[in-house]
UniProtKB/Swiss-Prot annotation:
GO biological process: biotin biosynthetic process
HAMAP family on file: BioB
Keywords on record: 2Fe-2S, 4Fe-4S, Biotin biosynthesis, Iron, Iron-sulfur, Metal-binding, S-adenosyl-L-methionine, Transferase
GO molecular function, one term: iron ion binding
Residues binding [4Fe-4S] cluster, per UniProt: C55, C59, C62
Protein's UniProt name: Biotin synthase
Origin organism lineage: Bacteria, Pseudomonadati, Pseudomonadota, Gammaproteobacteria, Lysobacterales
Gene: bioB
Needed co-factor(s): [4Fe-4S] cluster; [2Fe-2S] cluster
Pathway: Cofactor biosynthesis; biotin biosynthesis; biotin from 7,8-diaminononanoate: step 2/2
Length: 344
């Protein structure tokens, strides 16, 4: 099956996919998935909060916002040795990528060398590295790239026309600017959003449209289901229909055929059957480990058992400490095309 990677999707096209009968949508998504990936392989990442709590933002879903009474207390940045120990445990458990998250609006200049040291140590272990630190300027993105960072996560969170319902302290354009800085230095992007925040299907389509029309599709697209934390404004929001969540995965797979589509937050509350449908619909990445920043996640034993029951296996990724010229990613294709145009 030949699948063209497009950046010119429109709202009506994505709506038509969402509106397909459920079996037909899953069939199309599974066919696209098989054209680009081994359907039995799932990329496994582990996420560690290296700086928890005290964030000045007002994201309505987030227990780390200091303005909400959620029981999360602000903590200092972890020492590099602590991070390396956690990375070693993650690798032993089967993770191929180690993600480091900090509850900052944006990192201060004094923070960058400390995070860079973490990146270098984790990368030297043979793990892919990812960081999510808030907004970056061009110089900070370059410093992280020079330290050996592979991926930078910065989510769009929701559709542009629903964004102001969820967040007031950061503009949508701020997020797009950070993604541009990250792409410009050659970092791979991890960018997705959250569903189940009271949005409509039209808003979910808007989120996928924003992602699928970026200059380069994100290399990883995390689809988070809202974890409702007492004390946050979104606690008590009506739960999303599980089949609607699967539709979100399926349309993401069709619209961004070469991206990793990740089951992210909210997986702890998902049944094994729901997760199996998501894998069938094109999800091929998960966060592995018992905690995602401050919220729960299935324990590794449950995930290993689920993989065995479904005949799935962790994706094997070889990482060299030295940088490759053109890693096999969506962004690399954009980079190559730009280089060819520049030299033509």
């Amino acid at each position: 099956m030949s699948v063209v990677v497009r950046h010119d999707w429109d709202h009506k096209e994505l709506q038509a996919l969402f509106d397909l009968p459920f079996p037909e949508l899953l069939h199309r998504a599974a066919s696209v998935h098989r054209a680009h990936f081994d359907p039995a392989e799932v990329q496994v990442s582990t996420l560690l909060s290296v700086k928890t709590g005290g964030c000045p933002e007002d994201c309505a879903y987030c227990p780390q916002a200091q303005r909400y009474d959620t029981g999360v207390t602000a903590q200092k940045l972890l020492e590099t040795e602590e991070v390396v120990a956690k990375a070693r445990q993650a690798k032993a458990a089967g993770a191929s990528r180690f993600c480091m998250g900090a509850a900052w609006r944006s990192p201060k200049e004094r923070d960058i060398p400390k995070v860079a040291a973490m990146i270098r140590e984790v990368k030297a272990m043979g793990l892919e590295t990812c960081a999510t630190l808030g907004m970056l300027d061009a110089g900070q993105a370059r410093a992280l790239k020079d330290a050996g960072l592979d991926y930078y996560n910065h989510n769009l969170d929701t559709a542009p026309d629903y964004y102001d319902t969820i967040i007031h302290t950061r503009q949508y354009q701020d997020r797009l600017n950070t993604l541009e800085h990250v792409r410009d230095v050659g970092l791979k992007t991890c960018c997705g959003g959250i569903v189940g925040m009271g949005e409509t299907r039209d808003h979910r389509i808007g989120l996928l449209l924003a992602l699928a029309t970026l200059p380069a599709h994100p290399d990883s697209v995390p689809i988070n289901q809202l974890v409702q934390v007492p004390g946050t404004p979104l606690h008590g929001t009506q739960q999303l229909d599980p089949f609607e969540f699967v539709r979100m995965i399926a349309v993401a797979r069709i619209a961004m055929p070469k991206s990793m589509v990740r089951l992210s937050a909210g997986r702890e509350a998902m049944s094994d059957e729901l997760q199996a449908l998501c894998f069938l619909a094109g999800a091929n990445s998960i966060f592995y480990g018992e905690k995602l920043l401050t919220t729960g996640n299935p324990d590794t034993e449950r995930d290993q058992t689920l993989f065995q029951r479904l005949g799935l296996r962790p994706m094997q990724i070889t990482v060299d400490a030295a940088e490759h010229d053109h890693p096999a990613t969506v962004h690399a294709e954009i980079t190559r095309s730009a280089a060819c145009e520049h030299t033509a």
